[in-house]
Amino acid sequence: MAAPTKCQLRGRLVLLCSLLGMLWEARASQIRYSVPEETEKGYIVGNISKDLALEPRELAERRVRIVSRGRTQLFSLNPRSGTLVTAGRIDREELCAQSPRCLVNFKVLVEDRVKLYGIEIEVTDINDSAPKFQAESLEVKINEIAVPGARYPLPEAIDPDVGVNSLQSYQLSPNHHFSLNVQTGDNGAINPELVLERALDREEATAHHLVLTASDGGEPRRSSTVRIHVTVLDTNDNAPVFAQRIYRVKVLENVPPGTWLLTATASDLDEGINGKVAYKFWKINEKQSLLFQLNENTGEISTAKSLDYEECSFYEMEIQAEDGGGLKGWTKVLISVEDVNDNRPEVTITSLFSPVREDAPQGTVILLFNAHDRDSGKNGQVVCSIQENLSFTLENSEEDYYRLLTAQILDREKASEYNITVTATDRGTPPLSTEIHITLQVTDINDNPPAFSQASYSVYLPENNARGTSIFSVIAYDPDSNENSRVIYSLAEDTIQGSPLSTYVSINSDTGVLYALCSFDYEQFRDLQMQVTASDSGSPPLSSNVSLRLFVLDQNDNAPEILYPALPTDGSTGVELAPRSAEPGYLVTKVVAVDRDSGQNAWLSYRLFKASEPGLFSVGLHTGEVRTARALLDRDALKQSLVVAVQDHGQPPLSATVTLTVAIADSIPDILADLGSLQIPADLEASDLTLYLVVAVAVVSCVFLTFVITLLALRLRHWHSSHLLRATSDGLAGVPTSHFVGVDGVRAFLQTYSQEFSLTADSRKSHLIFPQPNYADTLISQQSCEKNEPLCVSVDSKFPIEDTPLVPQAPPNTDWRFSQAQRPGTSGSQNGDDTGTWPNNQFDTEMLQAMILASASEAADGSSTLGGGAGTMGLSARYGPQFTLQHVPDYRQNVYIPGSNATLTNAAGKRDGKAPAGGNGNKKKSGKKEKK
């Protein structure tokens, strides 16, 4: 054989070291003590705390305790001293019977370590029992012809002690015919025999009396005696003889009582009474005599009670056969009890660690239990198992002890409770099993933050809500339990329009209901962005955030506002001019209105609510343009009153009305003449303050008119047409009208002074408005126009209009009239489209409203640029490219600036040095300038 290699030697050495280590560990975990029997309760066996390397106080802290397997607890732990003491009186003979060594084994569990330590205690014997015979007297019959040397068995004494304290010797009282011989059996038992030394003579003595003494070797020595009565019989030649020297039989432990086991037969060659044999148990202990019965006539042995293999698996006894003549024979009977699988496994729970934290690491001990089967062989082999698909595993720790361990990290949110069934099954046929059911609770840890059902929330709230209104409820779910799942809601700190978010909304910390702390106005702001935080009450607390956007929905809470015509503060209405020669579709004026709402709440519709002459005028549904519906007739009244209603499309719709007064005349003098003939109620009285104001304005107007007339006279003295000058002067003497005088030149400036008489039929007052001078070059700079801030002064006239003579007027100059191209509208020469489509979205509508408001502001301030082209009122340059009539109702051109009858010329035409295409009057003036 080849020599082993170095690798093989190294491997064997490692294996040897491992085995030695395991043996050392096993030995180290086994603690041995000894204690004498019959000690009192509380006898100190050993210092177990020292042997476990623990302090006495740690026995309670670490929950150290004794675990045993169904046996009465013989020992206990003293937690104060850390010692192992007896729990009561210990009787070695009762505990271990005749075993040479009486060992008591149990386990000590250190629960916090989940570790078992083996404890072995040897109970030492003391000489507390004396040898004892089963009977106090014994009769022995011997035939007188017995040959010296014959031997007669004597009963044995029983001593439950062991060792030197057990039976050691027999002594026979002195006698000339008998002696004592002691035989030692295979099992070490001492068997006394009576030996005949001299022949007996019945005629000499019919009986002999002997005393047999049994003694042990203990200190003090104990003994007992039995009296032997020997009867000398007449001649009996043959003694009973058994067919077998030793009888052996096997029996199952589960046989019922009365089951026949065997028949021990002895034969006697004598006849008559000397040949009749009687049977009885000779050497049998008290327990065996209760389990078996013997027929004294037949020698049949049967069971008297049920046998139990686990209690005793082997029985040995002797049977005596005696004939009528007193001769005896003996035989030995050996009964083996065979095990059957009649015991189910026994499961004893040693420790149960419930509840267990869900974050317990893998391999955490949940259960420690003992599984034992009292049967033997395969019937006593136990296999334990648990149901499948659980997060646990079983491990056989040592001997019959098993540990239930966690196989993975537990999750309370998936399973908060486990119902575990442990099944212990033996290997017998058929197999028997035992089940135990345990309920394991899993305690929660705060390992889950609250979770919202959505990544973000969009909430819609109508404006003008009541304070304290419930807006929305956010819900966050925390799968943890108890305090770890109690969610607290809060809002992240933020600032909106300079104010803390907490002044606008609040949230209920328990329910997550969001409340409005103020009444929201869509026109102030339209949405709020906030962050909701959900925190649990665990330790440490976990939280999560969600974005919530609150949209304020517009409500129809604003009625349309009419920008033009603007109502004077005294409640009167303005007068619009319509020539009698106007054709159907003639643009008289335009009503401009806006709505501060949005969406369809701001979509406006115009309609003619009331008219003094039905059918004469029409109003554009979307544009607000007031046009003639038919040609004017002579029978039509001079003054026409129209009530135009503007209504939005909200629910419910809101509306506003404006009253328009339309004067039908071809020129301003005609208007004044016609209006002068109107009767004004005389019961209207003006205040003194109004009178003073009118007088002051009249004086200033006269001075200003004088200055203007003088200036014009000096400038126009070279004009060839004195008739035109006289006509103009006569016209100014009667009615102050607006003058627009332009001087051609590269750097010439034009100062325009405008006057406007606003005469109403409902008032005796006339309003004379003086705007500030407007300096502009021929290009009419938009910048300079935007700087104009009109100063309006009202002059009230106390005199009745009908009493004032009007100077006859010359034919109106075409320069003073509005051409069709210069009328307010989308186009100077085309009728408005009343069927335009509405904007398709809120953004377009809001942009359109912004443009209308901007245009209206410029109109109110008098700063609107007039050079943007005819019919656009200066809006085309800024807003023209975005929206046209073909797309949306033309709110951009709803800005109409009254009070001026100047010709709206094209700025581009002026820059080119070309006169605008006006009336004939312009052409004549231009020709005269060239001549000059």
Swiss-Prot record:
Its main location: membrane. Residues 714-932 are cytoplasmic. InterPro entries: Cadherin-like_dom, Cadherin-like_sf, Cadherin_C, Cadherin_CBD, Cadherin_CS, Cadherin_N, Protocadherin/Cadherin-CA. Coiled coil: none annotated. Keywords: Calcium, Cell adhesion, Cell membrane, Glycoprotein, Membrane, Repeat, Signal, Transmembrane, Transmembrane helix. Gene3D superfamilies: Cadherins (2.60.40.60). It is found in: Cell membrane. Residues 29-133, 134-242, 243-347, 348-452, 453-562, 570-683 form the Cadherin domain. It holds the Pfam family Cadherin_2. Residues 816-841 have a biased composition (Polar residues). One of its GO terms (molecular function) is calcium ion binding. Residues 803-841, 902-932 are annotated as: Disordered. CDD domains: Cadherin_repeat. Residues 29-692 are extracellular. Residues 922-932 have a biased composition (Basic residues). Glycans are attached at N47, N127, N389, N419, N545. PROSITE patterns: CADHERIN_1, CADHERIN_2. Residues 1-28 form the signal peptide. It is a single-pass type I membrane protein. The chain crosses the membrane at residues 693-713. One of its GO terms (cellular component) is plasma membrane. GO terms for biological process: cell adhesion; homophilic cell adhesion via plasma membrane adhesion molecules; nervous system development. SUPFAM superfamilies: Cadherin-like. Potential calcium-dependent cell-adhesion protein. May be involved in the establishment and maintenance of specific neuronal connections in the brain. This is Protocadherin gamma-A9. The lineage of its organism: Eukaryota, Metazoa, Chordata, Craniata, Vertebrata.
